[in-house]
Each structure stands twice: as structure tokens, then as C-alpha cells.
Amino acid sequence: VVLNAAVIRPEIQVITDVEEVFFDGLIEAWRVAIENIMENAFRYAKSYIKIEVREDWLCISNDGPKMPEDRIQSLFRPYEKGEGGRFGLGLSIVSKVCKANHYIVKGENSDDGVRFIIYRKVKKQRKKKENTWVKNKGEKA
């Protein structure tokens, strides 16, 4: 999506702040969900899209027009379109993927545009690694 949209809208800067993480669920379902958010971001952005990814959340924001506060969460229902939207299915698909994998999605206005956040209420438990090595003088931890 980013590469295709960059050809169509080269004036949009894509800013990334991404950690290597693993979200629960099927990779294809997440690809479709993220593509839907990114397509919307490219449709409405004025000059930039920012993608941030951490262990338990993902945020895609842009500097496009703000959404009416009373309509933001309704955009996750099927056939609900924002101004300039196409079919009203993209964010509904995002919502279904999130729910199926125990994540939450929300949209909100930001200081300079709109952002969509996917997150978990409960953080994933990380397993402790055994036999880790400290790179301090080659000593074993």
C-alpha cells in the first residue's frame, strides 16, 4: 500500500517509528486491516502519515481533516462512510480483525489531524530468556 500510494501521492511523507513486534492472529488478516487504515490515511492526508508500532499497540496518524466527534466510532460499523469515503467497509473490517484477535481499535482526532490506534487492554507477557549473555567482558549473566 505504501509503495503504491507513494506513486499516486508522492507529496505525502511517510514517517515510521517501528519496533519489531508480533501481533496475535493471521498475518493476512492484519495485512488487510493495516491496508485499509493506510488507504484512508493516504486519501485524507495533506502532507504526512506517521506509523508507530510498539509491543502492544500500533498507531497510524495523518494531518488530514479532523472527523466530527459524534461520528468517529460509528465509522467502524459496516457501510458507515466518512466524507469522501468509498464503500464504508474498510474500518469495519479493521474492527472485526481486531476483535477476533483480542485487540481494540479506536479513531480519534489529534492536534493536527486524525489517528487510528490498535491496542490490547492487557499487555502480553514476555517470556524470560534463559542463558542470556552479557556483552560486558564476555561474562555469562
Please describe what each predicted stretch is:
Residues 30-34:
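A residue-level detector for a conserved hydrophobic packing site
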Residues 40-42:
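Short helix-loop "hinge" at the ATP-lid/N-box region of the Bergerat-fold HATPase_c
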Residues 61-66:
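Glycine-rich acidic phosphate-binding loop
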Residues 46-57:
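Short beta-strand/loop element within the Bergerat-fold HATPase_c
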Residues 18, 22-28:
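Conserved micro-motifs of the catalytic ATP-binding
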Residues 67-79:
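Short conserved segment of the HATPase_c
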